[in-house]
Amino acid sequence: MADTPSSPAGDGGESGGSVREQDRYLPIANISRIMKKALPPNGKIGKDAKDTVQECVSEFISFITSEASDKCQKEKRKTVNGDDLLWAMATLGFEDYLEPLKIYLARYRELEGDNKGSGKSGDGSNRDAGGGVSGEEMPSW
């Protein structure tokens, strides 16, 4: 693995322009919130730990997405879907995570199917403004 950070596309930043740091990483507040869930109530997390996890998460996402994208390109498809990501995780040795993610993806698709077309109708569905499903419908991991 290279010593310098690569772009999220996994191409070393050669995808037509440099990626701004704030676009490369998940927000540190989100990272911190997730990390705190694994600690006792009085636990503290150092800035260096948050920064390290932020970097690792970005690298992991790039790693999985790049593998899935390569698969899609070979199959002459332009859109990476959840099944492609699961395939990439299996290919790259993350089999232990597949079953819970398959369950999550199936539930997500089930909820999306139930809510298709209801996002604009004002029917009280739990879609957010961007058309996504709100967190209260999805299982909490």
From Swiss-Prot:
The keyword Nucleus applies. InterPro entries: CBFA_NFYB_domain, Histone-fold, Transc_fact_NFYB/HAP3, Transcrpt_fac_NFYB/HAP3_CS. The modification N-acetylalanine is found at A2. One of its GO terms (biological process) is response to heat. GO terms for molecular function: DNA-binding transcription activator activity, RNA polymerase II-specific; protein heterodimerization activity; sequence-specific DNA binding. Induction: Enhanced by dehydration stress but repressed by heat stress. SUPFAM superfamilies: Histone-fold. Residues 1-23, 114-141 are annotated as: Disordered. It is found in: Nucleus. The keyword Nucleotide-binding does not apply. Its main location: nucleus. GO terms for cellular component: CCAAT-binding factor complex. Keywords: Acetylation, Activator, DNA-binding, Nucleus, Transcription, Transcription regulation. Residues 53-64 are annotated as: Subunit association domain (SAD). Ubiquitous. Predominantly expressed in leaves, flowers and siliques. Heterotrimeric transcription factor composed of three components, NF-YA, NF-YB and NF-YC. NF-YB and NF-YC must interact and dimerize for NF-YA association and DNA binding. Binds directly with DPB3-1. Component of the NF-Y/HAP transcription factor complex. The NF-Y complex stimulates the transcription of various genes by recognizing and binding to a CCAAT motif in promoters. This is Nuclear transcription factor Y subunit B-1. It comes from Arabidopsis thaliana (Mouse-ear cress).
